Curated annotation (Swiss-Prot):
<keyword id="KW-0460">Magnesium</keyword>
<dbReference type="Pfam" id="PF00953">
    <property type="entry name" value="Glycos_transf_4"/>
</dbReference>
<dbReference type="InterPro" id="IPR018480">
    <property type="entry name" value="PNAcMuramoyl-5peptid_Trfase_CS"/>
</dbReference>
<feature type="transmembrane region" description="Helical">
    <location>
        <begin position="199"/>
        <end position="219"/>
    </location>
</feature>
<protein>
    <recommendedName>
        <fullName>Phospho-N-acetylmuramoyl-pentapeptide-transferase</fullName>
        <ecNumber>2.7.8.13</ecNumber>
    </recommendedName>
</protein>
<dbReference type="InterPro" id="IPR003524">
    <property type="entry name" value="PNAcMuramoyl-5peptid_Trfase"/>
</dbReference>
<dbReference type="GO" id="GO:0008963">
    <property type="term" value="F:phospho-N-acetylmuramoyl-pentapeptide-transferase activity"/>
</dbReference>
<comment type="pathway">
    <text>Cell wall biogenesis; peptidoglycan biosynthesis.</text>
</comment>
<keyword id="KW-0812">Transmembrane</keyword>
<keyword id="KW-0131">Cell cycle</keyword>
<keyword id="KW-0961">Cell wall biogenesis/degradation</keyword>
<dbReference type="GO" id="GO:0046872">
    <property type="term" value="F:metal ion binding"/>
</dbReference>
<feature type="transmembrane region" description="Helical">
    <location>
        <begin position="25"/>
        <end position="45"/>
    </location>
</feature>
<feature type="transmembrane region" description="Helical">
    <location>
        <begin position="97"/>
        <end position="117"/>
    </location>
</feature>
<keyword id="KW-0472">Membrane</keyword>
<dbReference type="GO" id="GO:0008360">
    <property type="term" value="P:regulation of cell shape"/>
</dbReference>
<keyword id="KW-0997">Cell inner membrane</keyword>
């Protein structure tokens, strides 16, 4: 939004052209989102407490979690507000990739908000019925996937690139739509499954989102992409602003979500952030690298799939409890130890993922 204003003012007053620089707008984006989440955080927490929007805790989970009962939830609303506001202010809103990611963020946020509202306010333990949640996730996911496919301007935009190799790629064609759909919906639910401990989901989200911002900057630059032998996707660099806003909003939220948490993000935050990460990974053509960097989200999801599958087939459970973080809690690990070790794993995976850009 302010990019347009700067362009207009540049014709009358010199100096406003500086706002064309992507790096400056990314810095302003992260500072704006961080400032909003830090300043509004106490007010949001106070309002959630006044409205008695508190988290309900399962009786069959780790006993240490019972003390979390009543902790304000739906704090993801603060994250999304900060991200969207910063992006609207500092990103180029004529960029189709920015619009696609904003659409995913807002629509999946609404799905999560309805789910949280039914659970917490209406006291419906099931929240939004699973079939309707999946229906709306699928509808929104396919809308974006189809839109990106039909507006693709170069073959690179629908090609799957294999890391570690310079010239190994697969032109997906119409399968691009289904891959994009799976990335959006799959990681939306993966982040949601991971969001079970204080700060466990938001910090990996910030780290992976920041790494995607670096990749978006490189992929959107013809010189860097040619030098690194990676795909060049014109316009994708603008997503750096969104990724910066995500990092700022996430860090601001972590200030209040770190152990012991004063607020939880709820489905409104987890579903939206996971979907946003998924669609950004698709746009910058680094789906496989994204899988590597998002190893914690993948492991948490796989643990649930294995647990459910094993119980249905054999009547036995592989883990003491799924998702995986609960397994370690029931083994006697203190919650902060689980959280920090999962963060450390994410740091390693993100660094390895970024290293693949050069290892060709």
């Amino acid at each position: 939004m302010l990019v347009w204003l700067a362009n207009f003012l540049e014709s009358y007053v010199s100096g406003f052209g500086v706002f064309q620089y992507l790096t400056l707008r990314a810095i302003l984006g992260v500072l704006t989102a961080l400032g909003l989440s830090m300043v509004l955080g106490p007010w949001v927490i106070r309002k959630l407490n006044e409205l008695q929007i508190g988290q309900a805790i399962r009786d069959d989970g780790p006993q240490s979690h019972l003390s979390k009962s009543g902790t304000p939830t739906m704090g993801g609303t603060l994250i999304l507000f900060s991200i969207v506001t910063a992006t609207l202010l500092w990103a180029d809103l004529s960029n189709r990739y920015v619009l696609a990611v904003l659409f995913v963020t807002i629509t999946f946020g609404l799905i999560g908000w309805v789910d949280d509202y039914r659970k917490v306010v209406e006291k419906n333990s099931k929240g939004l019925p699973a079939k309707w949640k999946y229906f709306w996730q699928s509808a929104c996911g396919f809308i974006v996937a189809i839109a990106l496919f039909v507006t693709a301007q170069t073959p690179a935009e629908t090609t799957l690139y294999i890391p570690f190799f310079k010239n190994v790629a697969w032109q997906m064609g119409v399968l691009y739509v289904f891959v994009t759909y799976l990335m959006i919906v799959g990681f939306s639910n993966a982040v949601n499954l991971t969001d079970g401990l204080d700060g466990l989901a938001i910090m990996p989200t910030v780290m992976v989102g920041s790494a995607l911002g670096v990749i978006a900057y490189l992929v959107g630059n013809a010189n860097f992409s040619e030098y690194l032998h990676i795909a060049f996707v014109p316009g994708s660099g603008e997503l750096v602003v969104y990724c910066a806003a995500l990092a700022g909003a996430g860090l601001g939220f972590l200030w209040f979500n770190t152990y012991p948490a004063q607020v939880f993000m709820g489905d409104v935050g987890a579903l939206a952030l996971g979907a946003a990460l998924g669609v950004i990974a698709v746009i910058v053509r680094h789906e496989i690298v994204f899988f590597i960097m998002s190893g914690i989200f993948v492991m948490e999801t796989v643990s649930v799939i294995l647990q459910v599958g094993s119980y249905k087939l054999t009547g036995r459970r592989i883990f003491r409890m799924a998702p995986l973080h609960h397994h370690f809690e029931l083994k006697g690990w203190p919650e902060p130890r689980v959280i920090v070790r999962f963060w450390i794993i994410t740091v390693i995976l993100v660094l390895f993922g970024l290293a693949t850009l050069k290892i060709r």
